[in-house]
Structure formats: C-alpha cells, structure tokens
Amino acid sequence: MAFAAGAVVFPGGRVDPDDYLVARQHGPDVHEADGAARVAALRETLEETGLAVGWPALQERELADVRRALLAGTLLSDILAARGDRIALDSFVPFARWCPNFKEARTFDTRFYAVAAPPHGHELTVEEAEHSHIFWASAHRTLMMADRGEVSVIFPTRRNLERLARVADFDEFSAHSRQFPVELVTPWIEWCEGQSFLCIPDHLGYPVTRESFDRVRRG
C-alpha cells in the first residue's frame, strides 16, 4: 500500500462509484456516503480475505467464484443482480471516522465498521496485490504483538484496537459504539513538559487519547 506500508491494518479500501449504486439498491436509510462505505467494507473484505460479511445468501461453496469475479473487475451490482441476492448493510455498525493529516502525499477519510464474522470452514487467503499476509487475532493480542515489536501498528489502528480490546464480543462492542457519536477524528499535536503528543478528542469512546510523538513514529 502507498499508505501505512508494512503496517497491520483492518480489511478495507477505496469506495468505488458502483458502491453508491449498490447502497441505493440495498442500503438502510443512511447518508449516501455512509451506505457506500458499508458496501466498500463488504466488497473489500471479500476481495482481500475471502470472508463474506453482510451477505447471508452467499454460500461458502460459492465464495471463491464470486471473489474471483470481483477481482477480475466484475461490478458487485451486476453480481448481486444476476444472483438475485440482498446484502445486509444494516449489519455494519459504524464506530469511527478518521482523517489523519500526517503530511502524507494523500490523506484518507476512513470510516470504520464492526460486523459479525459469519461461521466458515474455509481457510482465508490474502489477495497479494496489496497485502503480504492476513491473520486472525484479538485486539488485545494484536496490541501485545505491537508492543513486542512483532508487528507495526499506526496511530489510528492502535486507538481502535484499544477500544476493541475493552469488550468481550461483537454484541458488547455494538452496544459500546452506540454510546458515542461518530465524528471525524483528525489528530493534532500538543506540547507538554518538553514532549510532543499526538492527541484526539476525549468524548468518542477511546480509552487512550494521546500518545508521545516518539512512540507514534516507532509504530
């Protein structure tokens, strides 16, 4: 990836024009950008990992063919129309929206959603055009791996992992998310006692709202 190269990230990617069409056809009554981002989350997770979230009609034996079609450029709207399927965009729980400005060549307005993983028996495999490998791990374990230097975790990912690590399961996290607004988070720098800290608002459900800039750079 051009952004956060080598870092551990959640599945996801760019919202495509077709995602807006799918959101209008299948989406709940939400803002069009929110609906399209939910579609992108569904599509990118399937493309990148082979896991189908929010698509109850898609059988496990059909996953590989649908994934290949998406990766080959077939539009999701055409696949859904041909199959006559409905996707469950209301199953995606919005919990964060970040737009960091770290003086990168590009900035990313990124929406984060939680969704229940469906039961599955197949092995998830990486889509190698953008990622080197994938793995399942709890938020707590991933934070421990980062603290030991086994993986690199950028500032927004660490803050979201810390939120996830506070709860036991999807239902508990969904309830937690509903207690806080989803507002655009753009971190800023503050100085305190000769140190610089990267900070975020303290009313959005994050247990840690600042981190020393030296540690942020270390990832």
Describe every region a protein language model picked out.
Residues 1-219:
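N-terminal leader/linker segments that precede catalytic domains of diphosphate-processing enzymes
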